[in-house]
């Protein structure tokens, strides 16, 4: 059994949205996306972490997943409009790559473009 993967908000604005404490990811896949509506619970049925965003959107409704694949932990762009940047490597959004293996230790994940506020640190 793999150790728990931890996801941290890497920007103060995101910490205010999701909390300053790390999110312990124990079950996979773990889907991150945009809040959909204030009329419902704001989450798509399979989204585990829903964050608010306003137009022009950086975060897609279903943006990226953190998954376990064999002995590896990977990030997979879920077909987002702006792509996902993992440790400086672009996934989706015109790139031919759609997943990246996370390294042991700290990994940087940006949902959207380089100017996106949706920046996370994932500890594997």
Give the residues covered by each predicted segment.
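Forkhead-associated
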Residues: 48, 63-65, 70-106
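Intrinsically disordered, low-complexity acidic Ser/Thr-rich regulatory segments
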Residues: 1-57, 101-108, 113-124
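Short histidine-centered beta-strand/loop micro-motifs
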Residues: 55-58, 75-77
